[in-house]
Amino acid sequence: MTQLAIGEATPHGATYDGHGVNFTLFSAHAERVELCVFDSRGNERRYDLPGRRGDVWHGYLAGARPGLRYGYRVHGPWQPAQGHRFNPAKLLLDPYARRVEGELKDHPLLHGGHDEPDYRDNAAVAPKSVIISDHYDWEDDAAPRTPWGKTVIYEAHVKGLTYLHPELPQEIRGTYKALGHPVMVAYFKQLGITALELLPVAQFASEPRLQRMGLTNYWGYNPMAMFALHPAWASSPETALDEFRDAVKALHRAGIEVILDIVLNHSAELDLDGPTFSLRGIDNRSYYWIRDDGDYHNWTGCGNTLNLSHPGVVEYACECLRYWVETCHVDGFRFDLASVMGRTPTFRQDAPLFAAIKACPVLSTVKLIAEPWDIGEGGYQVGNFPPPFAEWNDHFRDAARRFWLPRNLTTGEFACRFAASSDVFKRNGRTPGASVNLLTAHDGFTLRDCVCFNQKHNEANGEENRDGTNSNYSDNHGKEGLGGPLDLMERRRDSIHALLATLLLSQGTPMLLAGDEHGHSQHGNNNAYCQDNALTWLDWQQANRGLTTFTAALIRLRQQIPALTGNSWWEEGDGNVRWLNKNAQPLSADEWQNGPKLMQILLSDRFLIAINATLEVTDIVLPEGEWRAVPPFAGEDNPVITAVWQGPAHGLCVFQRG
């Protein structure tokens, strides 16, 4: 290999062209950038990047090939009070690295947030970037592009979903390969979901605190390399990218979209006591929101916050998203703590990143889902994201639980949430699909735990049960824990059925947590982010098959109801919905606000949802006509009903007009 040629300022990152590699690095405040390459024995050779265009440093290394390990040393001022922490003694990861060799260890040589610089070299323990060739034969792959009105999302963890599946080959359980295996594809199709939403698959690290406790970051919300696949779920780091793309291709052939949970709000460098391995040493002042004293704005609760209003960081974020769409053919993203994306530092709908995404012909046409909050002032922004974003709707989650698990909730509030929270989302040209309805998600109780525990039980996390929310709106039905007498277990079953029916038969985009259709429990742990064990892995052999069948039937029913699949707002008199009381009359103003939790919802003039959320058996007079219960509510003896349904306590039934 020879000395570096000047090369080009684009594309960003390290690009192999068949003859060598073009390297670029964004740093607005650097004074000099060294490219460091390593041979198989760890010997290092350094080259100055000779070119600079604007804030992008660049150079071309002829003869460099895939497999080359490299990093950067960045020279510049050490001025912590001004946010500058340049230290060429520290080897740094390329923010655009497609593959990373080595883990991020809790090691003193990786710390760089102190007042004085540490001039000890860290190359022996620092992770290294690796050049790859990302050629792949996609064959005839095509994005399913499922309309929002027909979309049913299934949130899952790559490992936890398949690690205990007895019908999968042992060697692929808990891996990317398993996601596209015919056993899993057949299950997804049988269940009826249309989109698989994966918890973070970009390479992440375990926080030093967890490492010292002997725990690991299981969920993956601690990003280390945003362009690289997490290697632990692949046969080898070298094959991770192709194995993931194989899974995407197999899912697409079955008509199933793949949505990635992505963490564009902070990095694994954490606070000033965290490791320095990339952005902090490359251009701390540009990449992060810095306070006047040089410390970080911690609007994420993770120690730092990415400055997604800086032009260079906006470009980085958009290129990351485009990489996953163009190179891996993913169909969309769920953005963790997405209010950070709109901070300028106050939240704005016209924030630079939102504008860039909307203007991008690639990103503006995929599914974009925001977790519409962060922990900073003004961070709660449910309903305020601009099109084309959809949003997680915590109003729906809390209302559904409060309605069915005895809490105070009016019929009017329940109906509003059932109708895609039009008071929140019917603005700026948005459709009902913008409301992503959920009962549960990876953080919080599972659905089964919602009906078995009144209190969180997070002792295994090592924080003396202080972590995790205390606002669960759960109900153990009289006994804390999973077991109980038969009548209690039946009440819990009825509550689960009612909650699932509410989720899957409401207007909006439903999201189902993987395992809820099995009756999966985390034994009351509502923050299992560090539990990579049987607590979080789905036990397929112990799955509640009846509940799975019930859930699949609800999804099939949903797809038959035009009022739910049309993705247009319901208007009075349009035939989509009528709200009735227990006597089949329109709900009065008093019943909306003060009546018992009894109602009927007539959808598309032929599907009737009869609801008794009270504690008493109650007769409900059905509208005129002949009605027959539909699966999963129809029993073997399913007579036509023309007058009254005897609604059991905490009961729900769906009828179709004959």
Curated annotation (Swiss-Prot):
CDD domains: AmyAc_Glg_debranch, E_set_GDE_Isoamylase_N. The keyword Hydrolase applies. It catalyses: Hydrolysis of (1->6)-alpha-D-glucosidic linkages to branches with degrees of polymerization of three or four glucose residues in limit dextrin. Keywords: Carbohydrate metabolism, Glycogen metabolism, Glycosidase, Hydrolase. Its EC number is 3.2.1.196. One of its GO terms (molecular function) is glycogen debranching enzyme activity. GO terms for biological process: glycogen catabolic process. Pfam families: Alpha-amylase (PF00128), CBM_48 (PF02922), GlgX_C (PF18390). The record marks D443 as: Transition state stabilizer. The active site is at D336 (nucleophile), E371 (proton donor). Residues 459-483 are annotated as: Disordered. It comes from the Bacteria. Pathway: Glycan degradation; glycogen degradation. The keyword Hydrolase applies. NCBIfam families: glgX_debranch, PRK03705.1. HAMAP family: GlgX. Belongs to the glycosyl hydrolase 13 family. Removes maltotriose and maltotetraose chains that are attached by 1,6-alpha-linkage to the limit dextrin main chain, generating a debranched limit dextrin. This is Glycogen debranching enzyme. The gene is glgX.
